Amino acid sequence: MNAERCEFIAGNSLIEVIPSISDDRPIHLISGDIGPFEAGVPCRIPVWTAILMKRKHNCKVVAPQWMDVDELKKILTSETESQGLAKLPDHFFEISHMLVRDAREDIFEVEAVKSLVQDIYDRRDAKLRSSAIEFLRQNQTCHAQLDNVQLIEASSARATLEACRQMGAVVRNKHESTPL
């Protein structure tokens, strides 16, 4: 899986928008109906729909509560202080990226938000890398459990995880083989 597929999956998450148009007809989708829309009345729609409406200037995107600078600072502090990965909202990085890219004028202090999200990603990436290194240093095979990993992180760590799996197979074969 790559970043584009992760964003595609995250695009089905619901987000609040304030429509600037009124339309009494709901939009019928496979996943369910969205709408009707009334100008100025907030409603929740999939992120991908919000981005399409935003591009047509038909709505204002309401950033999720966790996308506030103070909330992001709390998340960064939690990530820094905890040994493991902190629990994040579903599709945190993908939704952040899509909104910063496509709805930046609707995000308060967008540059600070972008910087904090990147800092959180970097901290988590460093933790994942150091965990993989520690796992590979072990002399015996065992299982690893990764809690609170985001889909995009698992996707980007796939090569490292595959290397760990192959290393485990090599170690197992070494212990199971008999000398000639």
Swiss-Prot record:
What keywords were assigned to this record? Answer: DNA replication, Nucleus
Where would you find this protein in the cell?
Answer: Nucleus
Q: Which InterPro entries match?
A: GINS_A, GINS_bundle-like_dom_sf, GINS_Psf2, PSF2_N
A Pfam family it matches: Sld5
Any single Gene Ontology cellular-component annotation = GINS complex
Q: Which cysteine pairs are covalently linked by disulfides here?
A: none
Chief subcellular location? nucleus
Report whether Translocase shows up as a keyword of the record.
Answer: no
Q: Name one GO biological process term.
A: double-strand break repair via break-induced replication
Please give the function described in this protein's UniProt entry: Required for correct functioning of the GINS complex, a complex that plays an essential role in the initiation of DNA replication, and progression of DNA replication forks. GINS complex is a core component of CDC45-MCM-GINS (CMG) helicase, the molecular machine that unwinds template DNA during replication, and around which the replisome is built.
Family listed:
Belongs to the GINS2/PSF2 family.
Per UniProt, subunit arrangement is:
Component of the GINS complex which is a heterotetramer of gins1, gins2, gins3 and gins4.
- What is the official name of this protein in its record? Probable DNA replication complex GINS protein PSF2
